[in-house]
């Protein structure tokens, strides 16, 4: 079996295609966005490979696995078990970190448990248990003739007169003791003060160091250890300042007796109670009610709503504030910012123990007076948040919560004991906070001695390999402690790719979805090297990809097309790259051979130095106090290697600030910055990302873009509808009335099968049309509402040509290249690139003011060369209306058409975070320090 044969694949829009795919090769599937690449790679090949493997398991095991739907295909042979690495599923679990996903943390836990050296957190001395022979040898290694005494500590730093203890010691025959550092006779002990802390050590033996003492010393040590419960001190008799030798037979700190259980891997896991910091439960952050969120606008007065829910409108709470104002003599009508710090403290944190006279008035106007302390607004919110049963109250209060690093563990997530175990003077949290590149250096230079080297050998190999794979997929800038929620789709995908290589499987079919997303050209070669490595192990690697380098590196290319959606689903060309270039119908071939290309614009829009948006002192994540200057009304690209700080600067700093000031939204807290100027040039900010436009099958392009409302109004205006009294609501499949109630307007009914995938069967009442018979009797221009929803955008544009409002909205969907999706197509079936373009179309169809700030993060994801051309036309059109466009992008075709580039770097992670150069593409291409310039120059 050296090939995979597919016959009659009809999944989604595939048109009954037949394919022969060579095994153990690197195969790139390419084509327009929406042409059916994912349908072939994921929904047919992967789904079938996975399904066959899972069906070989017992029925009992199958119920725990989510089964894939059986693809609509006549026959596939030559499949191997399949593993898919997609972008979607990043973990939203706050306990997942880069270290735990890659399993490096598990190996680190093992390493620290087996060769770690525990130390005392207070005295920084190694905890060690010694045998009597080791103690004797240590004493005998002192210079010969030295006068020493052996002490057994009985009482350490405890208050009291301790007369009983001293009498007991004397009665046991001991003559001397050292009390608080002074040696005295036990026959006449000093009187100890009751309120002071005392230390009492018994002198067990006094001797001069010489060779024949071994037996005597061993007996003395045994006595001393028994008396003291496991510790002994050897002190110099002549020089009281000399350093004393501390011995312990327990696994403990010889100074304070701090001891810990035997080291085991779970002590280093922050997801296990044995290792997690008890304050934050191993999350590394604590939630608290943030005064800055509670008081959004310090210019308002308390009466005017400085604290939401505590103003005039809320009678009960406002009475409390008024009584508080009478007591502390402040004015509830004065702006919050003008009140004294003490008033701020009382209002937010309460009056402590001080009783205050509160006047309460009930609905009838009767006043009652009660005296009690004021709990404070923040404490009140905290209490209500903990006690409430209502999810609405909890959601409302959650808006005021922020996170801060846990004070006990300083954000390391581990308990105190685990933070004080060292390997080569480095504790575990220090390794987790290193970037992966640094960690790799650390382990390469780690030299352990003797037995420890043998124990650690295998563990270190596993850690080293995994770090190396992460570096090879371009993730050297991440830290192991980075939370999984903060990773971008491309990063998460490449982490999973690295852990797959770490697994070293052979004979598997890997299906990858655009692994180059979010990767700078510089890291691309390493990524391709990784894929080729997977192939050379003996795996079939199938990649859905648009990247030119990937297509050139492939052994076998499959070009799906010729168009998208209903116009796609056929194999236009397949074979090595030369064969693809020779097929005139293949768009991919034309772009690869240079017959078509994305042109560099003839002239760029010059920047107007008067009109700029200036953000100063951005310091989020790895940004090093940078100042960003964006020309207003231009198409700007933010570039830089992965991890250089692009997303932090734009998505985490600029966007939240602009959102607060322009849209009045209070969603996200911007990363730290000093100042921003120039927002007055804009009236709104819009972020167009690739998140799905709706998570339910009921959401679709028609409802999202607002096309559906006028369509329903048209249907409600038909004479027949008016005669029956139908309103536009009758034509909605989301409300009772017009929809089919058997399937509640879904068109399908879900049948749960416990050992097989859930089956969706068309509803037998409406035959999948979503509406009841009466609604479907109404026709507009001869079509029912169901037939309209079933039209592609292109057909609908023609059909509604006479309705200008609809025609305009549909035209914008066509402008962004979505001619082929259906109006009623479920949002869950759209790809990321398609969802993003539906959003773009929605923005385009609004009447533009020409003063909008658009922010796009890697809009070329999932787009073919021809799609990128269309996207650029749309973005340039938006710019020509005077809008400002900021795009984070790695794609050189987009970068070269920008008016202005801001390049961050020079490296990722701690090696980045500076703005290297900003200016026109021609200026940037000349910058020696920039990695982007190196790749951009040949394009211009």
UniProtKB/Swiss-Prot annotation:
One of its GO terms (molecular function) is ATP binding. GO terms for biological process: nucleotide-excision repair; SOS response. PROSITE patterns: ABC_TRANSPORTER_1 (PS00211), ABC_TRANSPORTER_2 (PS50893). The keyword Nucleotide-binding applies. It is found in: Cytoplasm. Belongs to the ABC transporter superfamily. UvrA family. The UvrABC repair system catalyzes the recognition and processing of DNA lesions. UvrA is an ATPase and a DNA-binding protein. A damage recognition complex composed of 2 UvrA and 2 UvrB subunits scans DNA for abnormalities. When the presence of a lesion has been verified by UvrB, the UvrA molecules dissociate. Keywords: ATP-binding, Cytoplasm, DNA damage, DNA excision, DNA repair, DNA-binding, Excision nuclease, Metal-binding, Nucleotide-binding, Repeat, SOS response, Zinc, Zinc-finger. Signal peptide: none annotated. The gene is uvrA. One of its GO terms (cellular component) is excinuclease repair complex. A zinc finger (C4-type) spans 253-280, 740-766. Residues 310-587, 607-937 form the ABC transporter domain. ATP binds at residues 31-38, 640-647. This is UvrABC system protein A. It comes from the Bacteria. It comes from Escherichia coli O6:H1 (strain CFT073 / ATCC 700928 / UPEC). Forms a heterotetramer with UvrB during the search for lesions.
């Amino acid at each position: 079996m050296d090939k995979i044969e597919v016959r009659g694949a009809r999944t989604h829009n595939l048109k009954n295609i037949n394919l022969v795919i060579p095994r153990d090769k690197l195969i790139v599937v390419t084509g327009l966005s929406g042409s059916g690449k994912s349908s072939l790679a994921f929904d047919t090949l992967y789904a079938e490979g996975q399904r066959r493997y899972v069906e070989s398991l017992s029925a009992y095991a199958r119920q725990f696995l989510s089964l894939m739907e059986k693809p609509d295909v006549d026959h596939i042979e030559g499949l191997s078990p399949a593993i898919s690495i997609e972008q979607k599923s990043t973990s939203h679990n706050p306990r997942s970190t880069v270290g735990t996903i890659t399993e490096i943390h598990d190996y680190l836990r093992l390493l620290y448990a087996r060769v770690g050296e525990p130390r005392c957190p207070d005295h920084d001395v190694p905890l060690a248990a010694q045998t009597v022979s080791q103690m004797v040898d240590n004493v005998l290694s002192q210079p010969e003739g030295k006068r020493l005494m052996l002490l057994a500590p009985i009482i350490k730093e405890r208050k009291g007169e301790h007369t009983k203890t001293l009498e007991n010691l004397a009665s046991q025959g001991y003559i001397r003791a050292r009390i608080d550092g002074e040696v005295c006779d036990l026959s006449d002990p000093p009187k100890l003060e009751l309120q002071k802390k005392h230390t009492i050590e018994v002198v067990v033996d006094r001797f001069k160091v010489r060779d024949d003492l071994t037996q005597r010393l061993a007996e003395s040590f045994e006595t001393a250890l028994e008396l003291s419960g496991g510790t002994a001190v050897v002190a110099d008799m002549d020089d009281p300042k000399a350093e004393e030798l501390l011995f312990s037979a327990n696994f403990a700190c010889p100074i304070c007796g701090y001891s810990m259980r035997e080291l085991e891997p779970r002590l280093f896991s922050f997801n296990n109670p044995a290792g997690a910091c008890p304050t934050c439960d191993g999350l590394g952050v604590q939630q608290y009610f943030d005064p800055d969120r509670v008081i959004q606008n310090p210019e308002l007065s308390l009466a005017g709503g400085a604290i939401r829910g505590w103003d005039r409108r809320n009678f009960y709470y406002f009475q409390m504030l008024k009584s508080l104002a009478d007591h502390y003599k402040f004015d509830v009508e004065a702006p919050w910012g003008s009140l004294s710090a003490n008033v701020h403290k009382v209002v937010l944190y309460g009056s402590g123990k001080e009783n205050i006279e509160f006047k309460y008035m009930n609905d009838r106007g009767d006043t009652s007076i009660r005296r009690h302390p004021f709990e404070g607004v923040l404490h009140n919110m905290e209490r209500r948040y903990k006690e409430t049963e209502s999810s609405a109250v909890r959601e409302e209060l959650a808006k005021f919560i922020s996170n801060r690093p846990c004070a006990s563990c300083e954000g390391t997530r581990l308990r105190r004991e685990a933070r004080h175990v060292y390997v080569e003077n480095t504790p575990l949290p220090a390794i987790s906070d290193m970037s992966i590149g640094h960690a790799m250096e650390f382990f390469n230079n780690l030299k352990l001695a003797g037995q420890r080297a043998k124990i650690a050998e295998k563990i270190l190999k596993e850690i080293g390999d995994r770090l190396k794979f992460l570096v090879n997929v371009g993730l050297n800038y991440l830290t192991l402690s980075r939370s999984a929620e903060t990773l971008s789709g491309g990063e998460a995908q490449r982490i999973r790719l690295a852990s797959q290589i770490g697994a070293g499987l052979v004979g598997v079919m890997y299906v990858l979805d655009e692994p180059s997303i979010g990767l700078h050209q510089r890291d691309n070669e390493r990524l391709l090297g990784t894929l080729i490595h997977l192939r050379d192990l003996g795996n079939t690697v199938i990649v859905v990809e648009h990247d030119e380098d990937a297509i050139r590196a492939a052994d076998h290319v499959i070009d799906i097309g010729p168009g998208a959606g209903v116009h796609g689903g056929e194999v236009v060309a397949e074979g090595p790259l030369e064969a693809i270039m020779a097929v005139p119908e293949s768009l991919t071939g034309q772009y690869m051979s240079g017959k078509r290309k994305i042109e560099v614009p003839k002239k760029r829009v010059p920047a107007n130095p008067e009109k700029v948006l200036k953000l100063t002192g951005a310091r989020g994540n790895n940004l090093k106090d940078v100042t960003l200057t964006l020309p207003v009304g231009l198409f700007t690209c933010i570039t830089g290697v992965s991890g250089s700080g692009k997303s932090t600067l734009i998505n985490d700093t600029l966007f939240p600030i602009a959102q607060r000031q322009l849209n009045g939204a209070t969603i996200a807290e911007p990363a730290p910055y000093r100042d921003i100027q120039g927002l007055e040039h804009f009236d709104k900010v819009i972020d167009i990302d690739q998140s799905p436009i709706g998570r339910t099958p009921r959401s679709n392009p028609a409802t999202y873009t607002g096309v559906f409302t006028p369509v329903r109004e048209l249907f409600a205006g038909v004479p027949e509808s008016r005669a029956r009294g139908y309103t536009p609501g009758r034509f909605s499949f989301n409300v009772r009335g017009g929809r089919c109630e058997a399937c509640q307007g879904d068109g399908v009914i879900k049948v749960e099968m416990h050992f097989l995938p859930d089956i969706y069967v068309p509803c037998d009442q409406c035959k999948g049309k979503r509406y009841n018979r009466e609604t479907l009797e109404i026709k507009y221009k001869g079509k029912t509402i169901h037939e309209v929803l079933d039209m592609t955008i292109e057909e609908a544009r023609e059909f509604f040509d006479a309705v200008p409002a609809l025609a305009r909205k549909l035209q914008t969907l066509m402008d962004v290249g979505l001619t082929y999706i259906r109006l009623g197509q479920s949002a869950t079936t759209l790809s990321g690139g398609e969802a993003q373009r539906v959003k773009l179309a929605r923005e385009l169809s609004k009447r533009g003011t020409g003063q909008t700030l658009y922010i796009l993060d890697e809009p070329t994801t999932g787009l073919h060369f021809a799609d990128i051309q269309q996207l650029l036309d749309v973005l340039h059109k938006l710019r020509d209306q005077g809008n400002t466009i900021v795009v984070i992008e790695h794609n050189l075709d987009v970068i070269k058409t920008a008016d202005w580039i801001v390049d961050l770097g020079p490296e990722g992670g701690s090696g980045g975070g500076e703005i290297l150069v900003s200016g026109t593409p021609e200026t940037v291409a000349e910058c020696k320090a920039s990695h982007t310039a190196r790749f951009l120059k040949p394009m211009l």
